[in-house]
Amino acid sequence: MNNSNIDNAGWSFDNTYSKLPKSFLSITSPTPVKSPELIVLNDDLVNELGLNFSKISKKNLSELFSGNLLPEGSKAIAQAYAGHQFGHFTMLGDGRAVLIGEHVSKSNERYDIQFKGSGKTPFSRNGDGRAALGPMLREYIISEAMHALNIPTTRSLAVVKTGENVVRENVLNGAILTRVASSHLRVGTFQYIAARQNEDELKTLVSYTIDRHYPNIKKSKNQALDLIEVLMQKQIDLVINWMRVGFIHGVMNTDNMTISGETIDYGPCAFMDIYDPKTIFSSIDQLGRYAYFNQPNITKWNLARFAECLISLIDKNKDKAIEMATEIINSFEKNYEIKWLNMMRDKLGLFGEDTKDQILILDLLNWMHKNKADYTNTFCYLMDEKIKSDPIYKSENFILWKKRWEVRLKINNNTPEKYFKLMRSVNPLVIPRNHKVEEALEGANNENLTQLNKLITILKKPYQNQKSMMDYQSPGSINGKKYQTFCGT
């Protein structure tokens, strides 16, 4: 098969991670698949990467994104990492994913290009290395929705069907997702290297991470300590964004916390409809470890595990190093509270600060919880009663709260033009409603891509009032049952 058009599509690989010590990775290749078929290609991301596939046939694109054909300059590896999974430490690694290389765009941005579901690797343990179509399309839908919501995230470039079945509880269509990320460095990467107790390797990893993501701390007197601080701020910003839109990750293991501050791994994730801080969707999170309200606490817990990895580099005196790291981690709550309060002020169009703001915000959330109000639609109603009306907003308690809010809006020279502009920038009109995601996945599994393509299109502009969005705004039920998600591994 002619590979020239694929090689001439604009790829520019500069593979730095594969030059790290052998313990960091394993050289491997995607396992060829029988008859790949391209299901969805992200044209917007293609352009952002500076690629041009116009001269490549759909058949050859299918071969490319299945891993059957690799572009010139790529170097396929599986990355080693560990992780606390639901609090239990495990040695892991890319068990069903292959990083084919680091593509550098014309604007000098570096991107990992990874195939997920591409076959067995040395880290697969007892897994088959494969993925099913539903979970790969779910990641495509939700990661791209998160990007449109202005939330840091890995991206999805393409999904192909492999033409082969994967066996889980049922026999499913096999698929491969092409994931694009600033990097795949994780807290779990540091845990893996720290567990090897090789300080030179740990220093190499810290240096590599700073060069790649945080060059502003390169001249720091204590790089390890500053790396903890900068990652904490990144992760606080990320989880606050999740809370802003009602996103529940579902599997916040340390191997799913990136050093770049991007959301990664969309296995059992979902968006909250009715506001309930204890909402969980994941079938394997029976105790609610990763419930909506607990996401900040888990973020802090994961950061503490990250800090533990760096103790030996912070100070030669272990007790002093622990004290210094602990001081940073213990500042999490205060930093989070300030940023969360500011985020909620933005959602309500409030400028400046007022001592009663927190009470006003909590009273609204408590009302929403008590009255089973839709989280997203409540803020839509406050922006424009015509966008999403509901009899629930005619209740006496809500009207009384709304009057207090309207009084607060007038503080600090606020005007309707100013506060509505602010609210519209942070309150989405549409989110990936769970029933709509399921409809799209069911259609795709039955070779009907209509609902999938409609959903992807509507989610590209979540802050804009679109003619066809009304059908995507209402919460739904999955055959009247409580909605559950599954990790898809």
What are the language-model segments listed below?
Residues 1-81, 86, 281, 286-489:
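Regulatory N- and C-terminal appendages and interdomain linkers associated
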Residues 1-5, 16-20, 96-101, 161-166, ...:
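Short, mixed-charge, low-aromatic patches
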Residues 35-38, 43-61, 66-220, 259-262, ...:
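Conserved ATP-binding subdomain of kinase catalytic cores across diverse folds
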Residues 251-252, 257:
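Hydrophobic HxD+1 residue recognition
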Residues 135-136, 165-249, 260-366:
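ATP-dependent phospho-/nucleotidyl transfer catalytic cores
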Residues 29-30, 128-130, 225-226:
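Short, contiguous strand/loop micro-motifs
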